[in-house]
Every structure is written in C-alpha cells, then in structure tokens.
Amino acid sequence: MSQWNSAEWADLCSGAACPICRQGKPDGIVLELATSYLTSSINAPMRGYCCVVLKRHAVELHELSDEEAVAFTRDVQRVSRAIHELTRPVKLNYEIHGNTIPHLHMHLYPRHRGDPFEGRAIDPKLIKVSPYQVNEFANFVAELRARMSAG
C-alpha cells in the first residue's frame, strides 16, 4: 500500500498526526508573522534558505479563505523581499510540496551563480554539509530578523 493510501497519511492530512501541529510550532522559528512562522536551519540546502509555515493546519492553498490566502501570500512576499535584500540572488525559487509533511508551507531558495544546483532543480537530500561557516548562520538570522522588523 502506498503512503498516500494509508491511514497514517489520512491522519497527517487531517492534522491529527501532523508533526508541526503536534508540537504546536515548527522547528527553527526565526520570526512569528501574521499567519505563519518564518523558519530556517543551519543545515539548509543552501545559504539564505527559509520556509514560511502556516500557523493553522491546512494542506492545500485552496483550503484557505481568501483573507488567509492574501495574508499568507503577504507573509511570503515580506520574507522574499528580506531574503532578496540580504542575499542578492540571481533568482529566488518558491516551492510548495507537502508530499512528506502535508501542512501548508512554502520553501524559499535564493539561487546564485555556482550554487550546487545551478540551472536545475534543487534536491536537498544531496546536500550533506551545512552551507554556513561558524557564526554565519546566526548572523544571517539576526540580519533577517532586523530586516523583517524594519519592513
């Protein structure tokens, strides 16, 4: 039986077994926003990576009310602006999957010349080492918080 046909998958989608809902908040919170949490990780697949995680449980964007969808998109826009200002990427990728954890969240990947996936899709499983040097991640988080608080 595939994962998507299992009772476990149904429990994840309903929120009953959602790991984010069960612990109350996602890991790696940088900042609490209007409808979401801004998260990141020292073990991110690339420098400047962030994830915007909806506070309440929903699996799909269409499950949000119009007001929630606008507010979530506004949160993502604010985060993307701050990431762009901090990292000056060639391109900023936005990804919503939910295949592993069906709780609405959007990954933001700043893309740079020479990044490990230049010109192709990102595969986080291929990254085995943190992209950050000592103190670099803490500095990124502090700068990101400052930019988000200012704007």
Q: Which residues does each predicted region cover?
A:
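HIT superfamily nucleotide-processing domains
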Residues: 1-151
